[in-house]
Protein backbone atom coordinates (compact mmCIF):
# COMPACT_ATOMS: atom_id res chain seq x y z
CA UNK A 1 0.00 0.00 0.00
CA UNK A 2 1.39 3.41 -1.04
CA UNK A 3 2.19 5.85 1.73
CA UNK A 4 0.40 9.19 1.94
CA UNK A 5 2.17 12.06 0.23
CA UNK A 6 4.32 13.97 2.76
CA UNK A 7 5.57 17.50 2.11
CA UNK A 8 7.64 19.87 4.26
CA UNK A 9 7.16 23.61 3.74
CA UNK A 10 9.68 25.91 5.40
CA UNK A 11 10.05 29.65 5.86
CA UNK A 12 8.26 32.63 7.36
CA UNK A 13 9.16 35.66 9.43
CA UNK A 14 6.64 38.01 7.82
CA UNK A 15 3.23 37.72 6.23
CA UNK A 16 4.94 38.03 2.85
CA UNK A 17 6.46 34.58 3.36
CA UNK A 18 3.68 32.98 5.40
CA UNK A 19 0.67 33.74 3.20
CA UNK A 20 2.23 32.19 0.05
CA UNK A 21 3.36 29.17 2.06
CA UNK A 22 -0.15 28.55 3.38
CA UNK A 23 -1.60 29.07 -0.11
CA UNK A 24 0.75 26.41 -1.49
CA UNK A 25 -0.23 24.04 1.33
CA UNK A 26 -3.92 24.63 0.62
CA UNK A 27 -3.38 23.92 -3.09
CA UNK A 28 -1.59 20.67 -2.25
CA UNK A 29 -4.46 19.60 0.03
CA UNK A 30 -7.09 20.52 -2.55
CA UNK A 31 -5.47 18.27 -5.14
CA UNK A 32 -4.32 15.56 -2.68
CA UNK A 33 -6.59 15.65 0.41
CA UNK A 34 -4.70 12.75 1.98
CA UNK A 35 -1.37 14.63 1.87
CA UNK A 36 0.46 15.23 5.15
CA UNK A 37 2.06 18.68 5.36
CA UNK A 38 4.53 19.79 8.02
CA UNK A 39 5.72 23.38 8.31
CA UNK A 40 9.13 24.27 9.71
CA UNK A 41 9.51 27.84 10.97
CA UNK A 42 11.68 29.97 13.24
CA UNK A 43 10.98 30.00 16.98
CA UNK A 44 9.33 33.19 18.18
CA UNK A 45 8.39 34.36 14.70
CA UNK A 46 4.96 35.08 13.27
CA UNK A 47 4.58 31.70 11.54
CA UNK A 48 4.47 29.86 14.88
CA UNK A 49 0.99 31.34 15.43
CA UNK A 50 -0.28 31.92 11.90
CA UNK A 51 0.40 28.44 10.52
CA UNK A 52 -1.49 26.52 13.26
CA UNK A 53 -4.33 29.05 12.85
CA UNK A 54 -4.48 27.98 9.20
CA UNK A 55 -4.81 24.35 10.27
CA UNK A 56 -1.28 22.98 9.79
CA UNK A 57 1.30 21.61 12.26
CA UNK A 58 4.61 23.44 12.60
CA UNK A 59 8.00 22.74 14.18
CA UNK A 60 10.25 25.62 15.26
CA UNK A 61 14.00 26.04 14.76
CA UNK A 62 16.14 28.35 16.96
CA UNK A 63 17.53 30.04 13.85
CA UNK A 64 18.09 33.82 13.65
CA UNK A 65 19.24 36.25 10.98
CA UNK A 66 22.76 37.61 10.69
CA UNK A 67 23.33 41.08 12.13
CA UNK A 68 25.15 43.07 9.44
CA UNK A 69 25.89 45.96 11.81
CA UNK A 70 27.12 44.12 14.91
CA UNK A 71 29.38 41.26 13.85
CA UNK A 72 29.99 40.07 17.43
CA UNK A 73 26.33 39.10 17.73
CA UNK A 74 26.84 36.65 14.88
CA UNK A 75 28.77 34.24 17.11
CA UNK A 76 25.50 33.23 18.76
CA UNK A 77 23.75 33.32 15.37
CA UNK A 78 26.24 30.77 13.99
CA UNK A 79 25.68 28.53 17.02
CA UNK A 80 21.92 28.72 16.44
CA UNK A 81 22.40 27.93 12.75
CA UNK A 82 24.35 24.76 13.50
CA UNK A 83 21.79 23.73 16.12
CA UNK A 84 18.97 24.45 13.63
CA UNK A 85 20.59 22.31 10.95
CA UNK A 86 20.87 19.38 13.35
CA UNK A 87 17.26 19.82 14.44
CA UNK A 88 16.09 20.17 10.83
CA UNK A 89 17.87 16.93 10.01
CA UNK A 90 16.00 15.15 12.82
CA UNK A 91 12.66 16.62 11.72
CA UNK A 92 13.25 15.41 8.15
CA UNK A 93 14.40 11.98 9.31
CA UNK A 94 11.29 11.55 11.48
CA UNK A 95 8.75 12.96 9.00
CA UNK A 96 10.24 11.30 5.89
CA UNK A 97 8.99 13.87 3.34
CA UNK A 98 8.78 13.15 -0.38
CA UNK A 99 9.66 16.78 -1.21
CA UNK A 100 10.57 20.01 0.60
CA UNK A 101 9.48 23.54 -0.30
CA UNK A 102 11.26 26.73 0.81
CA UNK A 103 9.46 30.07 0.69
CA UNK A 104 12.15 32.32 2.19
CA UNK A 105 12.71 33.44 5.76
CA UNK A 106 15.19 32.28 8.38
CA UNK A 107 14.05 28.65 8.72
CA UNK A 108 14.13 27.80 5.02
CA UNK A 109 17.96 27.87 4.91
CA UNK A 110 18.78 25.03 7.33
CA UNK A 111 15.67 23.04 6.40
CA UNK A 112 16.23 23.05 2.63
CA UNK A 113 19.98 22.56 3.01
CA UNK A 114 19.45 19.45 5.14
CA UNK A 115 16.72 18.14 2.83
CA UNK A 116 19.05 18.43 -0.15
CA UNK A 117 21.90 16.71 1.71
CA UNK A 118 19.53 13.87 2.63
CA UNK A 119 18.46 13.33 -0.97
CA UNK A 120 15.00 14.90 -0.66
CA UNK A 121 13.99 16.88 -3.78
CA UNK A 122 13.65 20.59 -3.06
CA UNK A 123 11.74 23.46 -4.61
CA UNK A 124 12.33 27.09 -3.68
CA UNK A 125 9.96 29.96 -4.25
CA UNK A 126 11.69 33.30 -4.80
CA UNK A 127 9.10 36.04 -4.34
CA UNK A 128 11.23 39.10 -5.12
CA UNK A 129 12.67 40.54 -8.32
CA UNK A 130 16.12 40.41 -6.70
CA UNK A 131 17.02 37.02 -5.24
CA UNK A 132 17.92 36.80 -1.58
CA UNK A 133 21.24 35.41 -0.33
CA UNK A 134 19.67 32.27 1.18
CA UNK A 135 17.80 31.34 -1.98
CA UNK A 136 20.89 31.95 -4.12
CA UNK A 137 22.77 29.45 -1.95
CA UNK A 138 19.92 26.93 -1.87
CA UNK A 139 19.40 27.20 -5.64
CA UNK A 140 22.57 25.23 -6.37
CA UNK A 141 20.98 22.06 -4.98
CA UNK A 142 17.31 22.88 -5.70
CA UNK A 143 15.45 20.88 -8.32
CA UNK A 144 13.04 23.67 -9.28
CA UNK A 145 12.90 27.42 -8.63
CA UNK A 146 9.54 29.17 -8.88
CA UNK A 147 9.82 32.91 -9.53
CA UNK A 148 7.49 35.90 -9.85
CA UNK A 149 9.49 38.14 -12.19
CA UNK A 150 11.14 37.92 -15.60
CA UNK A 151 14.91 38.02 -15.83
CA UNK A 152 15.66 35.77 -12.83
CA UNK A 153 18.26 33.82 -14.83
CA UNK A 154 20.59 36.54 -13.51
CA UNK A 155 20.54 34.59 -10.25
CA UNK A 156 19.50 31.03 -11.05
CA UNK A 157 20.12 28.29 -13.62
CA UNK A 158 17.71 28.94 -16.47
CA UNK A 159 16.64 25.29 -16.78
CA UNK A 160 15.42 25.22 -13.16
CA UNK A 161 13.30 28.38 -13.36
CA UNK A 162 9.51 28.35 -13.66
CA UNK A 163 7.65 31.66 -13.87
CA UNK A 164 4.66 31.13 -11.57
CA UNK A 165 4.03 34.43 -9.81
CA UNK A 166 3.49 34.60 -6.06
CA UNK A 167 0.55 32.81 -4.43
CA UNK A 168 -1.86 35.15 -2.65
CA UNK A 169 -4.24 34.65 0.26
CA UNK A 170 -7.11 32.45 -0.84
CA UNK A 171 -9.88 34.70 0.44
CA UNK A 172 -8.74 37.52 -1.85
CA UNK A 173 -9.36 35.57 -5.03
CA UNK A 174 -12.93 34.60 -4.18
CA UNK A 175 -14.23 37.73 -2.44
CA UNK A 176 -17.59 39.13 -3.51
CA UNK A 177 -17.94 42.19 -1.28
CA UNK A 178 -18.89 45.40 -3.08
CA UNK A 179 -16.96 48.65 -2.68
CA UNK A 180 -19.93 50.29 -0.93
CA UNK A 181 -20.43 47.39 1.49
CA UNK A 182 -16.69 47.25 2.19
CA UNK A 183 -16.43 50.97 2.95
CA UNK A 184 -19.44 50.83 5.27
CA UNK A 185 -17.82 47.93 7.15
CA UNK A 186 -15.08 50.38 8.19
CA UNK A 187 -17.62 53.01 9.26
CA UNK A 188 -16.81 55.29 6.33
CA UNK A 189 -18.73 57.08 3.55
CA UNK A 190 -19.05 55.27 0.18
CA UNK A 191 -19.43 58.59 -1.65
CA UNK A 192 -15.85 59.63 -0.82
CA UNK A 193 -12.56 58.51 -2.34
CA UNK A 194 -10.82 56.06 -0.01
CA UNK A 195 -7.10 55.55 0.56
CA UNK A 196 -5.85 52.36 2.25
CA UNK A 197 -2.57 52.74 4.16
CA UNK A 198 -0.69 49.55 5.05
CA UNK A 199 2.88 48.84 6.07
CA UNK A 200 3.03 45.08 5.79
CA UNK A 201 2.07 42.64 8.53
CA UNK A 202 4.57 44.20 10.97
CA UNK A 203 3.79 47.85 10.22
CA UNK A 204 6.09 50.54 8.79
CA UNK A 205 7.63 53.33 10.86
CA UNK A 206 8.07 55.84 8.01
CA UNK A 207 4.55 55.45 6.65
CA UNK A 208 3.03 55.67 10.13
CA UNK A 209 5.03 58.81 10.92
CA UNK A 210 3.78 60.41 7.70
CA UNK A 211 0.20 59.81 8.80
CA UNK A 212 0.69 60.90 12.42
CA UNK A 213 2.43 64.10 11.33
CA UNK A 214 -0.04 64.69 8.52
CA UNK A 215 -3.38 64.44 10.32
CA UNK A 216 -4.18 68.07 9.45
CA UNK A 217 -3.67 67.24 5.76
CA UNK A 218 -5.96 64.24 6.15
CA UNK A 219 -8.63 66.45 7.74
CA UNK A 220 -8.49 68.91 4.85
CA UNK A 221 -8.10 66.35 2.05
CA UNK A 222 -11.74 65.63 1.22
CA UNK A 223 -10.76 61.94 1.05
CA UNK A 224 -11.01 59.24 3.72
CA UNK A 225 -8.46 56.76 4.99
CA UNK A 226 -8.21 53.21 6.32
CA UNK A 227 -4.94 52.99 8.26
CA UNK A 228 -3.37 49.71 9.39
CA UNK A 229 -0.53 50.61 11.76
CA UNK A 230 0.85 47.23 12.84
CA UNK A 231 0.66 46.14 16.49
CA UNK A 232 3.78 47.88 17.78
CA UNK A 233 2.64 51.29 16.50
CA UNK A 234 -1.05 51.29 17.43
CA UNK A 235 -0.61 53.00 20.83
CA UNK A 236 1.16 56.09 19.53
CA UNK A 237 -1.10 56.19 16.47
CA UNK A 238 -4.25 56.29 18.58
CA UNK A 239 -2.68 58.90 20.88
CA UNK A 240 -1.90 61.13 17.89
CA UNK A 241 -5.43 60.75 16.53
CA UNK A 242 -6.96 61.56 19.94
CA UNK A 243 -4.83 64.68 20.21
CA UNK A 244 -5.83 65.83 16.71
CA UNK A 245 -9.52 65.90 17.59
CA UNK A 246 -12.43 64.49 15.64
CA UNK A 247 -11.40 62.60 12.49
CA UNK A 248 -14.48 60.85 11.08
CA UNK A 249 -12.67 60.35 7.77
CA UNK A 250 -10.01 58.10 9.36
CA UNK A 251 -10.37 54.46 10.44
CA UNK A 252 -7.30 53.34 12.40
CA UNK A 253 -6.53 49.76 13.44
CA UNK A 254 -3.46 47.69 14.28
CA UNK A 255 -4.36 44.78 11.98
CA UNK A 256 -6.99 44.21 9.30
CA UNK A 257 -8.18 40.61 9.36
CA UNK A 258 -10.47 41.03 6.33
CA UNK A 259 -8.07 42.31 3.69
CA UNK A 260 -10.56 41.46 0.94
CA UNK A 261 -12.87 44.15 2.34
CA UNK A 262 -9.99 46.62 2.76
CA UNK A 263 -8.89 46.16 -0.84
CA UNK A 264 -12.47 46.43 -2.11
CA UNK A 265 -12.88 49.71 -0.23
CA UNK A 266 -9.66 51.23 -1.56
CA UNK A 267 -9.50 53.55 -4.56
CA UNK A 268 -5.76 53.91 -3.91
CA UNK A 269 -3.28 52.07 -1.68
CA UNK A 270 -0.13 53.28 0.09
CA UNK A 271 2.16 50.35 0.88
CA UNK A 272 5.66 49.00 1.30
CA UNK A 273 6.91 47.02 -1.71
CA UNK A 274 6.94 43.49 -0.35
CA UNK A 275 6.57 40.86 -3.05
CA UNK A 276 3.46 39.27 -1.54
CA UNK A 277 1.62 42.57 -1.27
CA UNK A 278 2.52 43.52 -4.84
CA UNK A 279 1.15 40.20 -6.09
CA UNK A 280 -2.15 40.95 -4.34
CA UNK A 281 -2.33 44.45 -5.86
CA UNK A 282 -1.72 42.96 -9.32
CA UNK A 283 -4.41 40.31 -8.92
CA UNK A 284 -6.96 42.83 -7.64
CA UNK A 285 -5.95 45.58 -10.12
CA UNK A 286 -5.33 48.16 -7.40
CA UNK A 287 -3.61 51.52 -7.99
CA UNK A 288 -0.77 51.84 -5.50
CA UNK A 289 1.93 54.21 -4.28
CA UNK A 290 4.89 52.09 -3.19
CA UNK A 291 7.29 53.24 -0.45
CA UNK A 292 10.03 50.58 -0.40
CA UNK A 293 11.53 49.73 2.96
CA UNK A 294 15.24 50.64 3.17
CA UNK A 295 15.72 48.05 5.92
CA UNK A 296 15.65 44.88 3.80
CA UNK A 297 18.39 42.69 2.36
CA UNK A 298 19.86 43.77 -0.98
CA UNK A 299 17.37 46.68 -1.11
CA UNK A 300 15.02 44.19 -2.79
CA UNK A 301 11.86 46.23 -2.17
CA UNK A 302 13.15 49.09 -4.32
CA UNK A 303 13.84 46.58 -7.08
CA UNK A 304 10.32 45.14 -6.67
CA UNK A 305 8.84 48.64 -6.93
CA UNK A 306 10.85 49.63 -9.99
CA UNK A 307 9.75 46.46 -11.80
CA UNK A 308 6.22 47.94 -11.67
CA UNK A 309 7.13 51.60 -12.10
CA UNK A 310 9.03 50.80 -15.31
CA UNK A 311 5.77 49.41 -16.73
CA UNK A 312 3.69 52.38 -15.53
CA UNK A 313 1.92 50.01 -13.14
CA UNK A 314 2.61 51.83 -9.85
CA UNK A 315 3.81 55.11 -8.38
CA UNK A 316 6.93 55.21 -6.23
CA UNK A 317 8.24 57.45 -3.45
CA UNK A 318 11.57 56.84 -1.71
CA UNK A 319 11.43 56.27 2.03
CA UNK A 320 13.59 59.34 2.65
CA UNK A 321 11.21 61.54 0.62
CA UNK A 322 7.98 60.19 2.11
CA UNK A 323 7.69 62.72 4.94
CA UNK A 324 7.50 65.62 2.49
CA UNK A 325 5.72 64.02 -0.44
CA UNK A 326 3.66 60.94 0.42
CA UNK A 327 0.33 62.28 1.67
CA UNK A 328 0.27 65.14 -0.86
CA UNK A 329 0.90 62.69 -3.70
CA UNK A 330 -1.77 60.30 -2.44
CA UNK A 331 -4.46 62.97 -2.10
CA UNK A 332 -3.57 64.40 -5.51
CA UNK A 333 -3.63 60.97 -7.20
CA UNK A 334 -6.89 59.72 -5.69
CA UNK A 335 -8.66 62.73 -7.25
CA UNK A 336 -7.39 61.87 -10.76
CA UNK A 337 -9.71 59.22 -12.28
CA UNK A 338 -7.63 58.80 -15.44
CA UNK A 339 -4.45 58.18 -13.44
CA UNK A 340 -6.22 55.62 -11.26
CA UNK A 341 -7.66 53.88 -14.32
CA UNK A 342 -4.27 53.75 -16.07
CA UNK A 343 -2.51 52.35 -13.00
CA UNK A 344 -5.24 49.74 -12.54
CA UNK A 345 -5.08 48.63 -16.18
CA UNK A 346 -1.29 48.34 -16.20
CA UNK A 347 -0.89 46.54 -12.87
CA UNK A 348 -3.56 44.00 -13.92
CA UNK A 349 -1.33 42.95 -16.84
CA UNK A 350 1.27 41.70 -14.35
CA UNK A 351 -1.09 39.39 -12.42
CA UNK A 352 -0.72 35.62 -12.12
CA UNK A 353 -4.07 34.02 -11.32
CA UNK A 354 -3.18 30.41 -10.45
CA UNK A 355 0.25 30.54 -8.83
CA UNK A 356 -0.38 28.22 -5.87
CA UNK A 357 -1.80 25.44 -8.05
CA UNK A 358 1.05 25.72 -10.56
CA UNK A 359 3.61 25.46 -7.75
CA UNK A 360 1.72 22.55 -6.17
CA UNK A 361 1.84 20.65 -9.47
CA UNK A 362 5.62 21.12 -9.60
CA UNK A 363 5.87 19.76 -6.05
CA UNK A 364 3.84 16.69 -7.09
CA UNK A 365 6.20 16.03 -10.01
CA UNK A 366 9.22 16.09 -7.72
CA UNK A 367 7.53 13.92 -5.09
CA UNK A 368 6.28 11.37 -7.65
CA UNK A 369 9.76 11.00 -9.14
CA UNK A 370 11.28 10.57 -5.68
CA UNK A 371 8.70 7.95 -4.67
CA UNK A 372 9.26 5.91 -7.83
CA UNK A 373 13.02 5.99 -7.36
CA UNK A 374 12.85 5.13 -3.65
CA UNK A 375 9.84 2.82 -3.45
CA UNK A 376 7.95 5.14 -1.06
Swiss-Prot record:
<keyword id="KW-0328">Glycosyltransferase</keyword>
<feature type="binding site">
    <location>
        <position position="201"/>
    </location>
    <ligand>
        <name>UDP-N-acetyl-alpha-D-glucosamine</name>
    </ligand>
</feature>
<comment type="function">
    <text>Cell wall formation. Catalyzes the transfer of a GlcNAc subunit on undecaprenyl-pyrophosphoryl-MurNAc-pentapeptide (lipid intermediate I) to form undecaprenyl-pyrophosphoryl-MurNAc-(pentapeptide)GlcNAc (lipid intermediate II).</text>
</comment>
<dbReference type="GO" id="GO:0051301">
    <property type="term" value="P:cell division"/>
</dbReference>
<feature type="binding site">
    <location>
        <position position="256"/>
    </location>
    <ligand>
        <name>UDP-N-acetyl-alpha-D-glucosamine</name>
    </ligand>
</feature>
<comment type="pathway">
    <text>Cell wall biogenesis; peptidoglycan biosynthesis.</text>
</comment>
<dbReference type="InterPro" id="IPR006009">
    <property type="entry name" value="GlcNAc_MurG"/>
</dbReference>
<keyword id="KW-1003">Cell membrane</keyword>
<keyword id="KW-0573">Peptidoglycan synthesis</keyword>
<dbReference type="GO" id="GO:0051991">
    <property type="term" value="F:UDP-N-acetyl-D-glucosamine:N-acetylmuramoyl-L-alanyl-D-glutamyl-meso-2,6-diaminopimelyl-D-alanyl-D-alanine-diphosphoundecaprenol 4-beta-N-acetylglucosaminlytransferase activity"/>
</dbReference>
<keyword id="KW-0808">Transferase</keyword>
<keyword id="KW-0961">Cell wall biogenesis/degradation</keyword>
<keyword id="KW-0132">Cell division</keyword>
<dbReference type="Pfam" id="PF04101">
    <property type="entry name" value="Glyco_tran_28_C"/>
</dbReference>
<dbReference type="GO" id="GO:0008360">
    <property type="term" value="P:regulation of cell shape"/>
</dbReference>
<dbReference type="InterPro" id="IPR007235">
    <property type="entry name" value="Glyco_trans_28_C"/>
</dbReference>
<dbReference type="GO" id="GO:0071555">
    <property type="term" value="P:cell wall organization"/>
</dbReference>
<keyword id="KW-0133">Cell shape</keyword>
<keyword id="KW-0472">Membrane</keyword>
<protein>
    <recommendedName>
        <fullName>UDP-N-acetylglucosamine--N-acetylmuramyl-(pentapeptide) pyrophosphoryl-undecaprenol N-acetylglucosamine transferase</fullName>
        <ecNumber>2.4.1.227</ecNumber>
    </recommendedName>
</protein>
<feature type="binding site">
    <location>
        <position position="301"/>
    </location>
    <ligand>
        <name>UDP-N-acetyl-alpha-D-glucosamine</name>
    </ligand>
</feature>
<feature type="binding site">
    <location>
        <begin position="14"/>
        <end position="16"/>
    </location>
    <ligand>
        <name>UDP-N-acetyl-alpha-D-glucosamine</name>
    </ligand>
</feature>
<dbReference type="GO" id="GO:0030259">
    <property type="term" value="P:lipid glycosylation"/>
</dbReference>
<keyword id="KW-0997">Cell inner membrane</keyword>
<keyword id="KW-0131">Cell cycle</keyword>
<dbReference type="InterPro" id="IPR004276">
    <property type="entry name" value="GlycoTrans_28_N"/>
</dbReference>
<dbReference type="GO" id="GO:0005975">
    <property type="term" value="P:carbohydrate metabolic process"/>
</dbReference>
<dbReference type="GO" id="GO:0009252">
    <property type="term" value="P:peptidoglycan biosynthetic process"/>
</dbReference>
<dbReference type="Pfam" id="PF03033">
    <property type="entry name" value="Glyco_transf_28"/>
</dbReference>
<dbReference type="GO" id="GO:0005886">
    <property type="term" value="C:plasma membrane"/>
</dbReference>
<comment type="similarity">
    <text>Belongs to the glycosyltransferase 28 family. MurG subfamily.</text>
</comment>
<feature type="binding site">
    <location>
        <position position="128"/>
    </location>
    <ligand>
        <name>UDP-N-acetyl-alpha-D-glucosamine</name>
    </ligand>
</feature>
<feature type="binding site">
    <location>
        <position position="169"/>
    </location>
    <ligand>
        <name>UDP-N-acetyl-alpha-D-glucosamine</name>
    </ligand>
</feature>
<dbReference type="GO" id="GO:0050511">
    <property type="term" value="F:undecaprenyldiphospho-muramoylpentapeptide beta-N-acetylglucosaminyltransferase activity"/>
</dbReference>
Amino acid sequence: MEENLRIIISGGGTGGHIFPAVSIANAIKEQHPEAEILFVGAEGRMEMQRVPAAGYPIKGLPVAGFDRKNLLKNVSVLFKLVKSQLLARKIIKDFKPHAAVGVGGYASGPTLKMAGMMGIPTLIQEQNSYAGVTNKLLAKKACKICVAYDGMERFFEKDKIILTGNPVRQGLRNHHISREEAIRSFGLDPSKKTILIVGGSLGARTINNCVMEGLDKIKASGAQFIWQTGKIYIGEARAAVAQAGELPMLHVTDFISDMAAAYSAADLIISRAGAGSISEFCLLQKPVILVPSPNVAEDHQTKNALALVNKNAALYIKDAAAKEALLDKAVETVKQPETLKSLSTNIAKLAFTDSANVIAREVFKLADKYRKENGR
